[in-house]
């Protein structure tokens, strides 16, 4: 039984274990050798989760939300004469476009509907037509809807056409197995408060060493300079350039240990997958249909279409919160939806309790 005051059925921040919370009861010094050694262990563990070819990759930790780490990559990796192709079918792809435009980076957009995956044929067409494209960015799990994008195919095109590939794996890393060396991903970005099941406070970039070295002097921001952050961590045994979120780092280290204890990414994926499958089946029993086609659906978060006219999400939200659950509103404009997350310290009995509450009358029409 989860001991939280309510269960977060969200894509992060999410419900964490009691033991992850407990390690944050102590204070730590950013200059302490024990703390910086832990930072180095975290960096190494993340690379080992990402690939079996660990010598080719390194990890950079970056203060702030996951978006800070995405912007650090966009602002540091793409040179002044570079051009970025962004595959977008949701809010987080659009955010990358916004970053590029704010940073005055030339950007090309491959746009699909929010419930449809990235169109590989269109991506290749754009690469063939525009030889000036140097980088490709794609969101793995677009939590706007819960759709999974075909990063294997996107990365193959990146390799085929000689482009640097950037994968926003914010809501998938640690919950879906991938090997970034096999896929030839150059920069993968995620966050502490997603599938690793830590708390908010920093993001991280797992970067191909050869590509990261090319970023020296390219940063468009002092605090978000990816290369400078990495160089300091490398040369000073895990030290961050500016004040690091010490409590969050300790919680994340504990979360990594708990991921290992659970059986690794494959075991966690299986739990998330079973949660999501049960959720869709049980929600179907009470009249809710998922937005995304089953073959494109992630195990991370599920969008459900409003069941009828007059359905009031806010009333449902308030009632479920009274029962001890927090869910997410929808985030797309063309279809009325709401979202339920399957990740965090969430188990099948939690999913059953949620739907039982809705079946008993928490569904407000």
Swiss-Prot record:
Q: Which UniProt keywords apply?
A: Aminotransferase, Pyridoxal phosphate, Pyruvate, Transferase
State the name under which the record lists this protein: 2-aminoethylphosphonate--pyruvate transaminase
* Role description: Involved in phosphonate degradation.
Q: Which GO terms describe its biological process?
A: organic phosphonate catabolic process
| Cofactor(s) recorded in Swiss-Prot or TrEMBL | pyridoxal 5'-phosphate
Q: Which reaction is catalysed here?
A: (2-aminoethyl)phosphonate + pyruvate = phosphonoacetaldehyde + L-alanine
User: Which Gene3D superfamilies does the annotation name?
Assistant: Aspartate Aminotransferase, domain 1, Type I PLP-dependent aspartate aminotransferase-like (Major domain)
According to the UniProt record, list the residues that bear N6-(pyridoxal phosphate)lysine.
Answer: 194
List the gene name. phnW
Q: How does it assemble?
A: Homodimer.
């Amino acid at each position: 039984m989860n001991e939280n005051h309510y269960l977060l059925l969200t894509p992060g921040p999410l419900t964490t274990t009691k033991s992850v919370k407990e390690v944050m009861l102590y204070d730590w010094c950013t200059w302490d050798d024990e703390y910086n050694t832990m930072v180095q262990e975290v960096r190494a563990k993340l690379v080992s989760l990402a690939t079996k070819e660990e010598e080719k990759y390194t990890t950079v930790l970056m203060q702030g939300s996951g978006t800070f780490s995405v912007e650090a990559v966009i602002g540091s990796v793409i040179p002044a004469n570079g051009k970025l192709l962004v595959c977008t079918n949701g809010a987080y792809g659009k955010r990358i476009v916004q970053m590029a435009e704010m940073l005055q980076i030339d950007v090309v957009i491959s746009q699909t509907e929010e419930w449809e995956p990235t169109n590989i044929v269109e991506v290749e067409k754009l690469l063939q037509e525009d030889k000036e494209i140097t980088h490709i960015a794609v969101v793995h799990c677009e939590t706007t809807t819960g759709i999974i994008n075909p990063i294997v195919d996107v990365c193959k095109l990146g390799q085929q056409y000689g482009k640097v590939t950037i994968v926003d794996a914010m809501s998938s890393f640690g919950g879906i197995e991938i090997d970034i060396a096999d896929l030839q991903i150059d920069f993968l970005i995620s966050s502490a408060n997603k599938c690793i099941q830590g708390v908010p406070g920093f993001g991280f970039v797992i970067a191909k060493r050869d590509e990261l070295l090319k970023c020296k002097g390219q940063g468009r921001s002092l605090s978000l300079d990816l290369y400078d952050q990495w160089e300091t961590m490398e040369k000073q045994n895990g030290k961050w350039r500016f004040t690091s979120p010490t409590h969050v780092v300790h919680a994340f280290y504990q979360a990594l240990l708990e991921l290992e204890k659970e059986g690794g990414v494959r075991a966690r994926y299986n739990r998330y997958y079973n949660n999501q499958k049960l959720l869709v089946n049980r929600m179907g029993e009470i009249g809710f249909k998922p937005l995304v086609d089953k073959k494109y659906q992630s195990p991370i978060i599920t969008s459900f279409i409003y069941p009828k006219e007059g359905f009031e999400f806010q009333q449902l939200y308030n009632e479920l919160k009274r029962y001890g659950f927090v869910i997410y509103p929808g985030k797309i404009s063309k279809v009325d939806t709401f979202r339920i997350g399957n990740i965090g310290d969430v188990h099948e009995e939690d999913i059953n309790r949620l739907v039982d509450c809705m079946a008993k009358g928490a569904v407000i029409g």
